[in-house]
Amino acid sequence: MLKLTDITWLYHHLPMRFSLTVERGEQVAILGPSGAGKSTLLNLIAGFLTPASGLLTIDDVDHTTTPPSRRPVSMLFQENNLFSHLTVAQNIGLGLNPGLKLNAAQQKKMHAIAHQMGIDNLMARLPGELSGGQRQRVALARCLVREQPILLLDEPFSALDPALRQEMLTLVSTSCQQQKMTLLMVSHSVEDAARIATRSVVVADGRIAWQGKTDELLSGKASASALLGIKG
């Protein structure tokens, strides 16, 4: 279980403050206007930002100040952060061993994830030789191969065409269910959120303004629907 209790980040001396509980294996969408604090929330969970105050626990262990490299979290960005001089296999392998010295079990795990992502025929290629969708599959494989209990998505598929974006969302959702991972996904699209997350959190002005069923939000009946431009 992921739990944030009054986790506070000072942005130009204006506090953003979050309290949130997410159960193990739950898939949650994080929505809200631009600049509301959605990415800040993910970066606090991932450890890329250190809160001024508050408590963050994962499975009842205090990770409030744990460095990102030691936090049981993986994060996928819109910019996939693949190393251009490394092959697909090497980029995925970094998720298992930063020195890329993989034993037989790790090699097997890497190829299993690549097969699951549909990129097992691309392992010798460089990122520059791949399409945008293929690069995001590689980046997702690198996250999943780490087998961390929490996966954070900061709009990684927003630049893809609609059909490919839906394909990637389905792939993420299915993979998280298979690995029993907790998923938190920032999105500007309530429709995308509804496809994989039964629960949504709406962030506004550095606070969690609303949380509840995604369908209720999409129907326009929720108090936060208007924040997203949804009319009942």
From Swiss-Prot:
GO terms for molecular function: ABC-type thiamine transporter activity; ATP binding; ATP hydrolysis activity. Residues 2-230 form the ABC transporter domain. It is a peripheral membrane protein. Its EC number is 7.6.2.15. It is found in: Cell inner membrane. The keyword Membrane applies. It catalyses: thiamine(out) + ATP + H2O = thiamine(in) + ADP + phosphate + H(+). Keywords: ATP-binding, Cell inner membrane, Cell membrane, Membrane, Nucleotide-binding, Translocase, Transport. ATP binds at residues 32-39. Coiled coil: none annotated. Part of the ABC transporter complex ThiBPQ involved in thiamine import. Responsible for energy coupling to the transport system. This is Thiamine import ATP-binding protein ThiQ. It comes from Escherichia coli O6:K15:H31 (strain 536 / UPEC). The gene is thiQ.
